[in-house]
Amino acid sequence: MIISTTSQLEGRPIAEYLGVVSSESVQGINFVRDFFARFRDFFGGRSQTLEGALRLAREQATEELKARARQLQADAVVGVDFEISMPSVQGGMVVVFATGTAVRLK
């Protein structure tokens, strides 16, 4: 399954657009394990806890996007976009949304 942020795939013409596919992944962030995460964020450092949660959420959202495209018998998902949200005021979770267009290639 090809995943691309572009609307076309070089050398691979699109035969059919199958529709929009989307997925999401929610990850809890345990700042107890990374007590200084907020201080690092404040002073411009990197939070390993947040980076790890974002990476995992993005990977899970991508895999779910592929699974939904396979259900449509797609060969690829083009125009993929990721959006990140932290709905908790305390920063206790991160949500990654992935959307794209499932396509069948020639």
Swiss-Prot record:
InterPro entries from the UniProt entry: UPF0145_dom_sf, UPF0145_YbjQ-like
Disulfide bonds: none
HAMAP family with a match to the protein in the record: UPF0145
Family under the similarity heading: Belongs to the UPF0145 family.
Annotated protein name in UniProt: UPF0145 protein PputW619_2377
Source species of the chain: Pseudomonas putida (strain W619)
